[in-house]
Protein backbone atom coordinates (compact mmCIF):
# COMPACT_ATOMS: atom_id res chain seq x y z
CA UNK A 1 0.00 0.00 0.00
CA UNK A 2 1.48 3.35 -1.04
CA UNK A 3 1.95 5.84 1.79
CA UNK A 4 -0.47 8.37 0.27
CA UNK A 5 -2.79 5.86 -1.38
CA UNK A 6 -4.52 6.79 -4.64
CA UNK A 7 -4.53 10.46 -5.64
CA UNK A 8 -7.60 11.62 -7.57
CA UNK A 9 -8.22 14.58 -9.85
CA UNK A 10 -9.46 17.86 -8.37
CA UNK A 11 -12.43 19.28 -10.28
CA UNK A 12 -15.20 21.67 -9.21
CA UNK A 13 -13.98 22.03 -5.64
CA UNK A 14 -13.61 18.33 -4.82
CA UNK A 15 -11.57 15.21 -5.47
CA UNK A 16 -13.13 13.08 -8.21
CA UNK A 17 -12.18 9.81 -9.84
CA UNK A 18 -10.72 9.94 -13.33
CA UNK A 19 -12.69 8.45 -16.20
CA UNK A 20 -10.40 5.43 -16.39
CA UNK A 21 -8.56 3.17 -13.95
CA UNK A 22 -5.14 4.13 -15.31
CA UNK A 23 -2.63 5.47 -12.78
CA UNK A 24 1.06 6.30 -12.55
CA UNK A 25 3.41 6.13 -9.58
CA UNK A 26 4.75 9.00 -7.50
CA UNK A 27 8.21 7.84 -6.40
CA UNK A 28 10.51 9.18 -3.70
CA UNK A 29 13.81 9.60 -5.58
CA UNK A 30 15.82 9.36 -2.36
CA UNK A 31 14.66 5.82 -1.60
CA UNK A 32 12.69 4.45 -4.55
CA UNK A 33 9.57 4.20 -2.35
CA UNK A 34 6.23 4.40 -4.16
CA UNK A 35 4.50 7.31 -2.43
CA UNK A 36 1.17 7.24 -4.28
CA UNK A 37 -0.73 5.96 -7.27
CA UNK A 38 -1.91 9.02 -9.20
CA UNK A 39 -4.89 8.86 -11.52
CA UNK A 40 -4.53 9.75 -15.20
CA UNK A 41 -7.09 12.21 -16.54
CA UNK A 42 -8.99 11.29 -19.69
CA UNK A 43 -10.20 13.58 -22.45
CA UNK A 44 -13.66 13.43 -20.88
CA UNK A 45 -12.13 14.65 -17.60
CA UNK A 46 -10.63 17.59 -19.47
CA UNK A 47 -14.10 18.51 -20.74
CA UNK A 48 -15.51 18.31 -17.20
CA UNK A 49 -12.71 20.53 -15.92
CA UNK A 50 -13.27 23.12 -18.66
CA UNK A 51 -17.03 23.21 -18.07
CA UNK A 52 -16.47 23.53 -14.32
CA UNK A 53 -13.92 26.30 -14.85
CA UNK A 54 -16.28 28.22 -17.12
CA UNK A 55 -19.02 28.13 -14.49
CA UNK A 56 -16.69 29.06 -11.66
CA UNK A 57 -14.98 31.85 -13.56
CA UNK A 58 -18.26 33.69 -14.08
CA UNK A 59 -18.91 33.63 -10.33
CA UNK A 60 -15.33 34.64 -9.52
CA UNK A 61 -15.21 37.51 -12.01
CA UNK A 62 -18.53 38.87 -10.72
CA UNK A 63 -17.10 39.32 -7.22
CA UNK A 64 -15.71 42.68 -6.21
CA UNK A 65 -11.97 43.19 -6.31
CA UNK A 66 -11.80 43.30 -2.51
CA UNK A 67 -13.75 40.04 -2.20
CA UNK A 68 -11.32 38.28 -4.53
CA UNK A 69 -8.37 39.82 -2.73
CA UNK A 70 -9.57 38.60 0.69
CA UNK A 71 -10.05 35.03 -0.55
CA UNK A 72 -6.56 34.91 -2.04
CA UNK A 73 -5.16 36.39 1.16
CA UNK A 74 -6.86 33.64 3.20
CA UNK A 75 -5.18 31.08 0.96
CA UNK A 76 -1.84 32.73 1.78
CA UNK A 77 -2.55 32.34 5.50
CA UNK A 78 -3.41 28.65 5.09
CA UNK A 79 -0.27 28.02 3.05
CA UNK A 80 1.85 29.54 5.79
CA UNK A 81 0.05 27.62 8.52
CA UNK A 82 0.68 24.35 6.64
CA UNK A 83 4.18 25.28 5.48
CA UNK A 84 6.11 22.48 7.20
CA UNK A 85 3.64 19.76 6.19
CA UNK A 86 3.65 20.88 2.56
CA UNK A 87 7.43 21.28 2.56
CA UNK A 88 7.94 17.71 3.73
CA UNK A 89 5.54 16.41 1.07
CA UNK A 90 7.50 18.38 -1.53
CA UNK A 91 10.73 16.86 -0.22
CA UNK A 92 9.36 13.33 -0.46
CA UNK A 93 8.02 13.88 -3.97
CA UNK A 94 10.94 15.82 -5.48
CA UNK A 95 13.93 14.69 -3.42
CA UNK A 96 14.81 18.29 -2.59
CA UNK A 97 16.25 18.76 0.89
CA UNK A 98 13.81 19.76 3.61
CA UNK A 99 16.27 22.50 4.58
CA UNK A 100 15.36 24.04 1.21
CA UNK A 101 11.64 23.29 0.82
CA UNK A 102 10.85 24.47 4.35
CA UNK A 103 12.28 27.93 3.74
CA UNK A 104 11.83 28.46 0.00
CA UNK A 105 9.21 26.54 -1.96
CA UNK A 106 5.99 27.26 -0.06
CA UNK A 107 7.28 30.53 1.41
CA UNK A 108 8.11 32.11 -1.95
CA UNK A 109 4.97 30.74 -3.58
CA UNK A 110 2.84 32.26 -0.82
CA UNK A 111 4.72 35.55 -1.23
CA UNK A 112 3.71 35.70 -4.89
CA UNK A 113 0.07 34.96 -4.07
CA UNK A 114 0.10 37.66 -1.39
CA UNK A 115 1.67 40.11 -3.83
CA UNK A 116 -1.07 39.59 -6.42
CA UNK A 117 -3.81 39.54 -3.79
CA UNK A 118 -2.72 43.08 -2.97
CA UNK A 119 -2.79 44.12 -6.62
CA UNK A 120 -6.36 42.94 -7.34
CA UNK A 121 -7.99 46.31 -6.49
CA UNK A 122 -5.37 48.08 -8.63
CA UNK A 123 -6.56 46.56 -11.92
CA UNK A 124 -7.78 49.71 -13.61
CA UNK A 125 -8.70 51.08 -17.00
CA UNK A 126 -7.98 54.48 -18.51
CA UNK A 127 -10.03 57.51 -19.52
CA UNK A 128 -8.83 59.22 -22.70
CA UNK A 129 -10.41 62.57 -23.69
CA UNK A 130 -10.96 63.05 -27.43
CA UNK A 131 -12.84 66.36 -27.63
CA UNK A 132 -15.35 68.28 -25.55
CA UNK A 133 -18.20 65.90 -26.39
CA UNK A 134 -16.40 62.57 -26.57
CA UNK A 135 -13.99 60.38 -24.66
CA UNK A 136 -12.70 56.81 -24.61
CA UNK A 137 -12.44 54.57 -21.60
CA UNK A 138 -10.82 51.17 -21.32
CA UNK A 139 -11.61 48.14 -19.22
CA UNK A 140 -9.20 45.38 -18.28
CA UNK A 141 -11.31 42.23 -18.41
CA UNK A 142 -10.31 38.67 -17.49
CA UNK A 143 -9.47 36.28 -20.30
CA UNK A 144 -11.71 33.47 -19.01
CA UNK A 145 -10.36 29.94 -18.56
CA UNK A 146 -6.58 29.62 -18.55
CA UNK A 147 -4.21 26.67 -18.31
CA UNK A 148 -1.01 26.30 -16.32
CA UNK A 149 1.42 23.47 -17.08
CA UNK A 150 4.13 23.02 -14.47
CA UNK A 151 7.64 21.61 -14.34
CA UNK A 152 8.86 19.01 -11.89
CA UNK A 153 11.53 21.05 -10.06
CA UNK A 154 9.35 23.54 -8.13
CA UNK A 155 5.84 22.02 -8.23
CA UNK A 156 3.85 24.10 -5.76
CA UNK A 157 5.88 27.27 -6.31
CA UNK A 158 5.30 27.14 -10.07
CA UNK A 159 1.59 26.40 -9.53
CA UNK A 160 1.38 29.54 -7.39
CA UNK A 161 3.44 31.65 -9.79
CA UNK A 162 0.97 30.79 -12.55
CA UNK A 163 -2.31 30.75 -10.65
CA UNK A 164 -1.75 33.90 -8.58
CA UNK A 165 -1.90 36.48 -11.41
CA UNK A 166 -4.50 34.44 -13.29
CA UNK A 167 -6.88 34.32 -10.34
CA UNK A 168 -6.14 37.88 -9.27
CA UNK A 169 -7.27 39.09 -12.70
CA UNK A 170 -10.57 37.20 -12.41
CA UNK A 171 -9.74 34.12 -14.47
CA UNK A 172 -10.08 30.42 -13.73
CA UNK A 173 -7.10 28.10 -14.12
CA UNK A 174 -6.83 24.42 -14.92
CA UNK A 175 -3.41 23.27 -13.76
CA UNK A 176 -1.54 20.23 -14.97
CA UNK A 177 1.45 19.42 -12.77
CA UNK A 178 4.39 17.41 -14.01
CA UNK A 179 3.74 13.69 -14.02
CA UNK A 180 6.94 13.31 -11.97
CA UNK A 181 5.85 15.57 -9.07
CA UNK A 182 2.07 15.97 -8.75
CA UNK A 183 1.33 15.74 -5.04
CA UNK A 184 1.61 19.26 -3.62
CA UNK A 185 -0.40 20.86 -6.43
CA UNK A 186 -3.39 18.78 -5.38
CA UNK A 187 -2.94 20.10 -1.84
CA UNK A 188 -2.91 23.64 -3.23
CA UNK A 189 -6.31 23.00 -4.82
CA UNK A 190 -7.63 21.93 -1.40
CA UNK A 191 -6.27 25.12 0.14
CA UNK A 192 -7.89 27.38 -2.46
CA UNK A 193 -11.26 25.72 -1.80
CA UNK A 194 -10.82 26.04 1.97
CA UNK A 195 -10.04 29.74 1.50
CA UNK A 196 -13.37 30.29 -0.28
CA UNK A 197 -12.44 30.16 -3.96
CA UNK A 198 -15.59 29.30 -5.94
CA UNK A 199 -15.75 25.72 -7.20
CA UNK A 200 -14.06 25.24 -10.56
CA UNK A 201 -11.82 28.29 -10.41
CA UNK A 202 -8.74 26.13 -9.74
CA UNK A 203 -8.89 22.58 -11.07
CA UNK A 204 -6.01 20.09 -11.18
CA UNK A 205 -5.67 17.39 -13.83
CA UNK A 206 -2.89 14.84 -13.42
CA UNK A 207 -1.39 12.82 -16.24
CA UNK A 208 1.14 13.02 -19.03
CA UNK A 209 1.93 16.13 -20.98
CA UNK A 210 1.65 14.17 -24.21
CA UNK A 211 -2.02 13.40 -23.48
CA UNK A 212 -3.50 15.75 -20.89
CA UNK A 213 -1.23 18.65 -21.79
CA UNK A 214 -2.10 18.35 -25.47
CA UNK A 215 -5.84 18.10 -24.82
CA UNK A 216 -5.67 21.28 -22.78
CA UNK A 217 -3.48 23.32 -25.13
CA UNK A 218 -5.61 22.36 -28.12
CA UNK A 219 -8.95 22.98 -26.39
CA UNK A 220 -10.87 25.72 -28.24
CA UNK A 221 -12.31 27.28 -25.07
CA UNK A 222 -8.99 27.82 -23.31
CA UNK A 223 -7.86 31.44 -23.64
CA UNK A 224 -4.25 31.27 -22.43
CA UNK A 225 -1.55 28.69 -21.69
CA UNK A 226 1.33 29.31 -19.31
CA UNK A 227 4.00 26.62 -19.60
CA UNK A 228 7.24 25.92 -17.74
CA UNK A 229 9.56 23.24 -19.08
CA UNK A 230 12.05 22.41 -21.79
CA UNK A 231 12.43 24.43 -24.97
CA UNK A 232 11.60 21.55 -27.32
CA UNK A 233 8.34 20.81 -25.49
CA UNK A 234 7.59 24.52 -25.19
CA UNK A 235 7.70 24.95 -28.96
CA UNK A 236 5.19 22.11 -29.36
CA UNK A 237 2.90 23.63 -26.73
CA UNK A 238 3.10 27.03 -28.41
CA UNK A 239 2.35 25.55 -31.83
CA UNK A 240 -0.69 23.59 -30.64
CA UNK A 241 -1.99 26.55 -28.63
CA UNK A 242 -1.81 28.92 -31.58
CA UNK A 243 -3.09 26.50 -34.22
CA UNK A 244 -6.23 25.62 -32.28
CA UNK A 245 -7.60 29.01 -31.27
CA UNK A 246 -4.86 31.67 -31.22
CA UNK A 247 -4.38 31.34 -27.47
CA UNK A 248 -2.09 33.68 -25.64
CA UNK A 249 1.00 31.97 -24.24
CA UNK A 250 3.66 32.48 -21.60
CA UNK A 251 6.70 30.21 -21.94
CA UNK A 252 9.37 29.83 -19.25
CA UNK A 253 11.86 27.50 -20.93
CA UNK A 254 15.44 26.25 -20.80
CA UNK A 255 18.72 27.99 -20.22
CA UNK A 256 22.50 27.67 -20.30
CA UNK A 257 23.27 30.79 -18.37
CA UNK A 258 26.68 32.49 -18.06
CA UNK A 259 28.24 33.72 -14.83
CA UNK A 260 31.08 36.14 -15.58
CA UNK A 261 33.70 36.65 -12.88
CA UNK A 262 35.77 39.78 -13.50
CA UNK A 263 39.42 40.20 -12.56
CA UNK A 264 38.58 42.65 -9.77
CA UNK A 265 35.97 40.40 -8.14
CA UNK A 266 36.14 39.20 -4.56
CA UNK A 267 37.05 35.59 -5.36
CA UNK A 268 35.52 34.13 -2.20
CA UNK A 269 32.22 35.86 -2.87
CA UNK A 270 32.39 34.84 -6.53
CA UNK A 271 32.96 31.20 -5.53
CA UNK A 272 29.99 31.34 -3.15
CA UNK A 273 27.81 32.75 -5.93
CA UNK A 274 28.99 30.09 -8.39
CA UNK A 275 28.15 27.36 -5.88
CA UNK A 276 24.59 28.65 -5.43
CA UNK A 277 24.27 29.09 -9.20
CA UNK A 278 25.11 25.43 -9.80
CA UNK A 279 24.34 23.20 -6.81
CA UNK A 280 21.25 24.66 -5.15
CA UNK A 281 18.35 22.21 -5.54
CA UNK A 282 20.93 19.68 -6.71
CA UNK A 283 21.42 21.78 -9.82
CA UNK A 284 17.81 21.46 -10.98
CA UNK A 285 17.03 25.15 -11.49
CA UNK A 286 16.27 26.60 -14.92
CA UNK A 287 18.25 29.78 -14.27
CA UNK A 288 21.43 28.04 -13.10
CA UNK A 289 24.69 29.70 -14.13
CA UNK A 290 26.36 26.57 -15.42
CA UNK A 291 28.89 28.34 -17.68
CA UNK A 292 31.29 29.99 -15.24
CA UNK A 293 33.72 32.32 -17.01
CA UNK A 294 36.92 33.12 -15.06
CA UNK A 295 39.95 35.22 -16.09
CA UNK A 296 42.72 32.84 -17.16
CA UNK A 297 45.11 34.28 -14.58
CA UNK A 298 42.63 33.55 -11.76
CA UNK A 299 41.44 30.11 -12.86
CA UNK A 300 43.69 28.02 -10.60
CA UNK A 301 42.84 30.08 -7.52
CA UNK A 302 39.13 29.93 -8.35
CA UNK A 303 39.27 26.15 -8.85
CA UNK A 304 40.81 25.74 -5.41
CA UNK A 305 38.04 27.76 -3.79
CA UNK A 306 35.34 25.79 -5.61
CA UNK A 307 36.89 22.43 -4.66
CA UNK A 308 37.03 23.55 -1.02
CA UNK A 309 33.34 24.47 -1.07
CA UNK A 310 32.20 21.32 -2.89
CA UNK A 311 33.87 19.29 -0.15
CA UNK A 312 31.58 21.01 2.37
CA UNK A 313 28.34 20.01 0.61
CA UNK A 314 26.22 17.80 2.86
CA UNK A 315 24.61 15.19 0.61
CA UNK A 316 22.24 12.76 2.30
CA UNK A 317 18.69 11.97 3.33
CA UNK A 318 16.68 15.01 2.19
CA UNK A 319 14.34 14.64 5.19
CA UNK A 320 17.29 15.43 7.50
CA UNK A 321 17.48 19.19 8.11
CA UNK A 322 21.30 18.95 8.11
CA UNK A 323 21.26 17.82 4.46
CA UNK A 324 21.64 20.53 1.82
CA UNK A 325 22.01 18.35 -1.28
CA UNK A 326 19.47 15.68 -2.16
CA UNK A 327 18.96 13.28 -5.07
CA UNK A 328 17.85 14.20 -8.54
CA UNK A 329 14.12 14.18 -9.15
CA UNK A 330 13.97 10.72 -10.74
CA UNK A 331 16.09 7.75 -11.73
CA UNK A 332 15.41 8.51 -15.38
CA UNK A 333 16.73 12.05 -14.99
CA UNK A 334 19.75 10.72 -13.09
CA UNK A 335 20.68 8.61 -16.12
CA UNK A 336 20.39 11.67 -18.35
CA UNK A 337 22.73 13.69 -16.13
CA UNK A 338 25.22 10.83 -15.89
CA UNK A 339 25.26 10.57 -19.69
CA UNK A 340 26.23 14.25 -19.91
CA UNK A 341 29.00 13.72 -17.36
CA UNK A 342 30.32 10.83 -19.43
CA UNK A 343 30.19 13.05 -22.52
CA UNK A 344 32.16 15.76 -20.75
CA UNK A 345 34.92 13.30 -19.90
CA UNK A 346 34.89 11.89 -23.42
CA UNK A 347 35.26 15.36 -24.98
CA UNK A 348 38.28 16.23 -22.84
CA UNK A 349 36.99 18.35 -19.97
CA UNK A 350 38.95 17.79 -16.74
CA UNK A 351 36.99 16.59 -13.72
CA UNK A 352 37.79 18.81 -10.76
CA UNK A 353 35.16 17.34 -8.43
CA UNK A 354 32.63 14.51 -8.53
CA UNK A 355 31.82 13.01 -11.87
CA UNK A 356 29.95 9.92 -10.71
CA UNK A 357 26.83 8.52 -9.11
CA UNK A 358 26.83 8.31 -5.31
CA UNK A 359 26.32 4.67 -4.32
CA UNK A 360 27.78 4.20 -0.83
CA UNK A 361 25.33 2.97 1.81
CA UNK A 362 21.83 4.41 1.54
CA UNK A 363 22.85 6.48 -1.49
CA UNK A 364 22.50 3.31 -3.56
CA UNK A 365 18.71 3.37 -3.07
CA UNK A 366 18.32 6.83 -4.54
CA UNK A 367 19.00 8.92 -7.63
CA UNK A 368 22.08 10.65 -6.22
CA UNK A 369 24.75 12.21 -8.44
CA UNK A 370 27.87 13.76 -6.92
CA UNK A 371 28.29 17.55 -7.26
CA UNK A 372 30.42 17.72 -10.39
CA UNK A 373 32.80 20.42 -11.60
CA UNK A 374 34.46 20.31 -15.01
CA UNK A 375 37.30 22.67 -15.87
CA UNK A 376 39.45 23.32 -18.93
CA UNK A 377 36.15 23.46 -20.81
CA UNK A 378 35.70 24.88 -24.30
CA UNK A 379 32.65 26.47 -25.90
CA UNK A 380 32.12 23.61 -28.35
CA UNK A 381 31.74 20.90 -25.69
CA UNK A 382 28.31 19.30 -25.25
CA UNK A 383 28.30 20.01 -21.51
CA UNK A 384 28.86 23.71 -22.28
CA UNK A 385 26.26 24.00 -25.03
CA UNK A 386 23.32 21.90 -23.80
CA UNK A 387 21.12 22.26 -20.73
CA UNK A 388 21.91 19.41 -18.32
CA UNK A 389 19.61 20.39 -15.44
CA UNK A 390 21.79 18.76 -12.84
CA UNK A 391 24.72 19.46 -10.50
CA UNK A 392 27.31 20.03 -13.23
CA UNK A 393 29.43 23.21 -13.38
CA UNK A 394 31.65 24.07 -16.35
CA UNK A 395 34.59 26.43 -15.78
CA UNK A 396 35.83 28.35 -18.82
CA UNK A 397 38.74 30.80 -18.94
CA UNK A 398 38.86 34.08 -20.87
CA UNK A 399 41.25 36.97 -21.53
CA UNK A 400 39.24 40.12 -22.32
CA UNK A 401 35.87 41.67 -21.49
CA UNK A 402 34.89 41.89 -25.14
CA UNK A 403 35.70 38.21 -25.64
CA UNK A 404 33.73 36.97 -22.64
CA UNK A 405 30.63 38.97 -23.57
CA UNK A 406 30.71 37.53 -27.08
CA UNK A 407 31.13 33.98 -25.79
CA UNK A 408 28.49 34.40 -23.09
CA UNK A 409 25.97 35.44 -25.75
CA UNK A 410 26.95 32.64 -28.15
CA UNK A 411 24.03 30.39 -27.21
CA UNK A 412 20.48 29.77 -28.36
CA UNK A 413 19.32 30.44 -24.81
CA UNK A 414 18.86 33.73 -22.99
CA UNK A 415 17.26 33.04 -19.64
CA UNK A 416 19.71 34.39 -17.07
CA UNK A 417 23.18 35.87 -16.60
CA UNK A 418 25.34 37.24 -13.82
CA UNK A 419 28.43 39.35 -13.22
CA UNK A 420 30.78 39.42 -10.24
CA UNK A 421 32.83 42.63 -9.97
CA UNK A 422 33.61 45.43 -7.52
CA UNK A 423 33.33 48.05 -10.28
CA UNK A 424 29.67 49.04 -10.48
CA UNK A 425 30.11 50.84 -13.80
CA UNK A 426 31.70 47.74 -15.28
CA UNK A 427 28.90 45.59 -13.88
CA UNK A 428 26.19 47.60 -15.62
CA UNK A 429 28.20 47.89 -18.82
CA UNK A 430 28.54 44.11 -19.09
CA UNK A 431 24.98 43.34 -17.97
CA UNK A 432 23.54 45.72 -20.58
CA UNK A 433 25.35 43.78 -23.30
CA UNK A 434 24.28 40.31 -22.17
CA UNK A 435 21.35 38.73 -24.01
CA UNK A 436 19.37 37.45 -21.04
CA UNK A 437 16.06 38.28 -19.40
CA UNK A 438 17.04 37.76 -15.74
CA UNK A 439 20.35 39.20 -14.56
CA UNK A 440 22.18 39.46 -11.25
CA UNK A 441 25.13 41.59 -10.16
CA UNK A 442 27.17 40.10 -7.29
CA UNK A 443 24.32 37.69 -6.52
CA UNK A 444 22.46 34.78 -8.07
CA UNK A 445 19.09 33.12 -8.00
CA UNK A 446 16.68 35.28 -6.02
CA UNK A 447 13.36 35.82 -7.81
CA UNK A 448 11.14 37.97 -5.59
CA UNK A 449 7.46 38.43 -6.38
CA UNK A 450 8.07 41.99 -7.54
CA UNK A 451 10.66 40.97 -10.17
CA UNK A 452 9.44 40.03 -13.69
CA UNK A 453 11.22 36.85 -14.80
CA UNK A 454 11.52 35.31 -18.25
CA UNK A 455 13.95 34.74 -21.05
CA UNK A 456 15.26 36.02 -24.35
CA UNK A 457 15.75 33.92 -27.51
CA UNK A 458 14.84 30.21 -27.06
CA UNK A 459 14.36 30.64 -23.30
CA UNK A 460 10.83 31.89 -23.34
CA UNK A 461 7.99 34.25 -24.22
CA UNK A 462 6.34 36.63 -21.79
CA UNK A 463 7.08 37.11 -18.10
CA UNK A 464 6.04 35.74 -14.73
CA UNK A 465 5.79 37.78 -11.52
CA UNK A 466 5.83 41.53 -11.25
CA UNK A 467 3.08 43.99 -12.16
CA UNK A 468 3.43 43.36 -15.90
CA UNK A 469 2.44 39.70 -15.56
CA UNK A 470 -0.94 40.65 -14.14
CA UNK A 471 -1.73 42.56 -17.32
CA UNK A 472 -0.96 39.43 -19.36
CA UNK A 473 -4.00 37.76 -17.78
CA UNK A 474 -6.37 40.52 -18.93
CA UNK A 475 -7.57 41.90 -22.25
CA UNK A 476 -8.39 45.50 -22.96
CA UNK A 477 -11.83 46.60 -24.08
CA UNK A 478 -11.92 50.13 -25.52
CA UNK A 479 -15.19 52.07 -25.40
CA UNK A 480 -15.83 55.41 -27.14
CA UNK A 481 -18.58 57.56 -25.65
CA UNK A 482 -20.22 60.39 -27.64
CA UNK A 483 -22.10 62.92 -25.54
CA UNK A 484 -23.15 65.19 -28.40
CA UNK A 485 -24.76 64.68 -31.76
CA UNK A 486 -23.68 62.14 -34.37
CA UNK A 487 -23.11 63.06 -38.02
CA UNK A 488 -23.58 60.37 -40.65
CA UNK A 489 -22.13 60.72 -44.14
CA UNK A 490 -25.23 59.05 -45.56
Curated annotation (Swiss-Prot):
GO molecular function terms attached to this record: betaine-aldehyde dehydrogenase (NAD+) activity; metal ion binding
GO biological process: glycine betaine biosynthetic process from choline
Catalytic activity, as annotated: betaine aldehyde + NAD(+) + H2O = glycine betaine + NADH + 2 H(+)
Keyword annotations: Metal-binding, NAD, NADP, Oxidation, Oxidoreductase, Potassium
Binding-site residues, K(+) 2: 246, 457, 460
Modified-residue entries (Cysteine sulfenic acid (-SOH)), positions: 286
Active site per database record: 162 (charge relay system), 252 (proton acceptor), 286 (nucleophile), 464 (charge relay system)
Pathway the protein acts in: Amine and polyamine biosynthesis; betaine biosynthesis via choline pathway; betaine from betaine aldehyde: step 1/1
Marked site: Seems to be a necessary countercharge to the potassium cations: 248
InterPro entries named in the record: Ald_DH/histidinol_DH (IPR016161), Ald_DH_C (IPR016163), Ald_DH_CS_CYS (IPR016160), Ald_DH_CS_GLU (IPR029510), Ald_DH_N (IPR016162), Aldehyde_DH_dom (IPR015590), BADH (IPR011264)
Oligomeric and partner information: Dimer of dimers.
Family per similarity comment: Belongs to the aldehyde dehydrogenase family.
Protein name: Betaine aldehyde dehydrogenase
Species in which this protein is naturally found: Pseudomonas entomophila (strain L48)
